[in-house]
Amino acid sequence: DCTGCGVCVDQCTVNKGGKLAPALTWSTLEAERAAGENENEKFFNDVLPDNVMGSNTITTVKGAMLRKPLFEFSGACAGCGETPYVKLMAQLFGENVMIANATGCSSIYGGTFPTIPYTKDKNGRGPAWANSLFEDNAEFGFGMRMAVDANRALLKQEVETILASDKAPADLKDALNGAMSHWDNSKTPEAVEAQNKAKAAIAKALEGCGCEHLKKVSELSDYFCDKSVWIVGGDGWAYDIGYGGIDHVLAQGKNVNILVLDTEVYSNTGGQASKSTPTAAVAKFAAGGKKTYKKNMGFMSMSYGYVYVASVAMGADRNQTMKAFLEAEAYNGPSIIFAYAPCIAHGID
């Protein structure tokens, strides 16, 4: 989706009468609505499928971009370097993702009424998002992981009780066994199909049964598929104010993913220096150039020996960025991605 950076308007040209002229021009929202863009928007949302991947796979840049983004049209600054990472995360994992968002830029463009950018697919599934305080977001996301694990454990226990019962219908047992066979690999297309069959069988069985175990399974049926927990925030949160929480969460070894949107300054409050700011960089509170080194949080995280650590810059290498996100999601343990993001606070014209 467009980030409003304006590069296409500045750089894309066409030959008009032997002279190069802009191929695109800026237009106001009111003018585009008057020209019929509302109808076009209905076509894109209501008629087109959620993904048009064809033979492309989600593990490629091209394939992933042919999926519906479940984060779109944010109110971030023009050309924001953070939003492409959030959009990629929602595009890859959005149907099952739970996001704990630290206060900062990403909480402003991510959850400020009325421009809430998180959306859902045609099945009504999309990211679950919540914003905590600046100083406890890592712990907040860790709590989400613990809650998911507890709900999945309870669901498994209730399903096993039903499967052990002589009174449960055979078709219900077959459907539940099918869903449980994908318990440890629950996000594949085959697993999702089995889970949907189980949900349908549960709903059918409930029509003629008041079994408390079955009611509980129905309440928890969304947890047949494990949730993807992402803890998101900026470098001011990760390197400074919330670092203690991140360190504690990484040390627990649980399956959480941390995305650090690293602009190397406190972007939301005007571009002040953080511990992520490189040596000699000029920023607010470091007008003469920052005298100390950038905190090497990646090495600090690697010292645990069981944390997946990646450093990415989408503008430098899209394939490596994709690979890092997919590997972090696939790793059954704590992962942290440091995502370099250009920012308007850098003052680059």
Predicted ranges, named:
Residues 9-11, 21-24, 95-100, 105-108, ...:
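Beta-sheet entry/capping signal
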Residues 1-32, 56, 60, 84, ...:
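Iron-sulfur cluster-binding cysteine motifs and their immediate structural context
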Residues 12, 48-62, 209-223, 265-267, ...:
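Structured alpha-helical segments in the cores of large, soluble enzyme domains
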Residues 12, 63-66, 71-103, 107-114:
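N-terminal amphipathic, basic-rich helices that act as targeting or association modules
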Residues 134-212:
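N-terminal leader/propeptide and maturation segments of large enzyme subunits in energy/redox metabolism
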Residues 1-4, 24-34, 61-74, 217-218, ...:
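Ferredoxin-like iron-sulfur electron-transfer modules
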Residues 225-231, 240-255, 261-349:
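Glycine-rich ThDP/TPP pyrophosphate-binding loop and its adjacent helix/strand module
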Residues 37-56, 117-128, 273-295:
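Acidic, Ser/Thr-rich peripheral helices and adjacent loops at domain boundaries
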